[in-house]
Swiss-Prot record:
Name recorded for this polypeptide: Nitrogen permease regulator 3
Described purpose of this protein according to its UniProt entry: Mediates inactivation of the TORC1 complex in response to amino acid starvation. Required for meiotic nuclear division.
Chain's gene name: npr3
Amino acid composition bias (Acidic residues), ranges on this chain: 246-256, 665-674
Skewed-composition ranges (Gly residues): 257-267
Classification of source organism: Eukaryota, Fungi, Dikarya, Ascomycota, Pezizomycotina
Organism whose genome encodes this protein: Neosartorya fischeri (strain ATCC 1020 / DSM 3700 / CBS 544.65 / FGSC A1164 / JCM 1740 / NRRL 181 / WB 181)
Listed InterPro entries: HTH_NPRL3, Npr3
Start-end of Basic residues biased regions: 43-52, 221-231
Amino acid sequence: MSSIARPPDPCLVAIILIVRSRAGPRFVFHYPPNPLSENGLRPVRKERRTSRSKNGQGYKSNESSSSEESGSSSDDDEDEHQRQLQSQNQSQSHLSGSVVSGRRSSNFGLDDHVAMSVSPGGDSQRAGSMGSGRTSFRKRGGNSDVEEDSGAASDRQEDGSGGAGGPYRPPWESLLGLPADVWEKLLSPSPAWHKRRFEVGINDLAFIGWPVFVREDGTWRKQRRKKKKKWRAEWEGGELGHNENAEDAPDDEDGDAGGNASGGGGLMAASTETLSPKQMALSEAKRGSGSSSKAARSSVDCLDGDDKDSMTMFNVVFVLDPPLLEYSMRTREIYDNIIKKFAKALKWEQARTDYVWREAQHISHLKEKAKERRTSLNTLYTELINQSSLARAIYTVYTSISASKIASVQLSPDVSISLQIPPLTSTPYLPGPTDKAYPGLWLTTADSVTPVEDPTADENTAPHQVLAKHFALLLLDNEAAILKDVEASGGALAPALAHYLRCSKPTKSFAQISASSGIPLSTIQMLASHLVYWRRARAIPPIHQRDTYIVSPNCDLSKLEIATAAYQVAFPTLPSLPKMLSALSGTPRPYGSFIPSKDHKETYFAILAWLLRGGWVTQLRSFARVKVTPEIKMAVEVALRREEVDKYLRKGRSLEAQKSADGENGNEADENDDASSSSSSSLASQGSGDETPMPGRYQQESNLRLSHSMLDRNTSLRTSSLILFPHRASPLESRWLEQIVSRFPEHPRTAGRHRRGEGSNAAGGEIDPEYAALSTPMKDLWPTYIKYFNGLDALEKIPVREGLKRKLVWQVLTRLGLVTSQQSSIELDPREQVLVSVRHW
């Protein structure tokens, strides 16, 4: 698997709605109507199967060939079907499958006997049975349950699909080659799966849902203890202008109501209603006469009166086809961001207005009428999406999420929800020869969490993580347009967002905006995260004229002509886009050198923001590590060996003194012993000195060997080394750093050259503040800078994080050996040249 970080790939094949009542489970609705044709890019699928077979998990050769024959036999029908769909009315455009036409998809035909597995919630890898026991996709005969191609099934009346004289089976009562009753049983779990991740694996597909069961008291939501105030029937929105925090959402059994809902007409519009019981009654009456036809509603009400049935469970199941090596990541992101939140919103509306059950009955009634009239598949789905808000919601979620867009779904006049998989806004890698390229994606390492920012940070943190206070906000749209959307939303965050947007500048960090505007830093970070999450802004290092910017190697030159026209409209009197890109393609130099005068500063900053917004340029940043020369290594080696020898000699002298003292005490106690016996024993000990154990002798040698553990025998003393992480240095690396610091001069060479006053007494004058970094001993500056010399943190962070002037910081870095395109006239001391630096994005 490549290290390239990929944009969201939902791998979405279909969405299924299953409900269970006292009469049993029911397959209510699925979209798209025929995933076999809408996701049928068979050549790509063949490559995936071939790669899996190499790993011992693919099909056998005969099965693969059978599948290939089955796929090719229906190509002509599919081509004819595509031509028919292209000529469809605009009202039926939702059946064309254009949303997923560019996605990697396949033939998902399933046998009656399929290998499947059910796994509990979690982020585990695909279960073993999903890759084993695979069945071939065989073309079936007249008695088959395989779903027919929609070109034949949707545009003509059929006498029956169960053979000559058999009962009529409409095409919408089967999915992926299996009849609806199979899916009803398979995707209707037991109550033990209530509000848990329910996952079923069948061949290459994953079926993931979040089933919701009715409570024992017959309600769908735990009733909280109400205080003496009116009941609030509101769903706090999660799009622009609305807070998506769990504590601001309605109380739920698990303390989180899904969070990302909003009301409104447009993508960024949102409204939150607080309804009294009277308003709720009016809202129900309004909803009853809304999008659905009154005749159909009255028919359903009649059925409800006779049936007296009630729903006990609903499960919205998402059918996914993720790549095998990305299975866990892709399923987790769509489960956390889409499946769970969508099901929670439906649960909340079901508890409030019996929404899911009413819509399920309405959909079933429309399908029964279509079956009686033998309506075509296209006509039925057009009718369902026009008349059922739940069917329309599932359709919107599928089409938007498949295209990696924000799905704004309106469940009722009072409640809507916005869902998305947070997009990838940047990448630190250039694609390799075998990797898929994403031209125009911002190429930078600036948004990565580094050890200095958060040493314990997890790479898989949530998208709403707190942004670093030293970042700035770059709006991805016109400020006036965003302000208009925010003010129109009317959400709880709208006033704060509008105030922050007016104060925000890409040249000022969050901390600087907080200090100048009086807005608390935590509030700014929350508002900025809100804008970033909803794709209206991007967090970047603050723009500065002393920073260096280059043309991004990942820029999309195919859009240069369109971008040039847009650039000309935005900056008509300034150099054209090709000229700006040509200038930035030369020798890297600070951006301030491109600004003609101070009067043009703000305008050129606006140009830079425009270029960054489109991914045309990226910041060229410097990184450094501490270099340990052979001279330093040898000095530390000699010092360590001297310490070991001294320690060994000290222990030896102390043991000899102890031995002599013990000998004197022994002679006094044994002076009356037999002389010959004592002499004999003494001679024997002297004759076998190498074989007779002496107290402490081997223990001393052992201690000497163990103390050598600091001396790494694999380290070469003749070559230089780099210290990767100075703030987590090993004992030996710590000794190297101590030796480096000990060699720094006490008085810099330039200390006397940058004092105020001239003449013989200049050395005793005050230090010029402009050159304070050149006159300060490096030993005093070293602790502030060393933590950034890890090769991961850009040196451009130091002035912002430490609150230092950029000029002084670069003077210190130049003394330490930083190589830049602009070399100053600073006199360097070789004893301070300890850095190895590189420059990249």
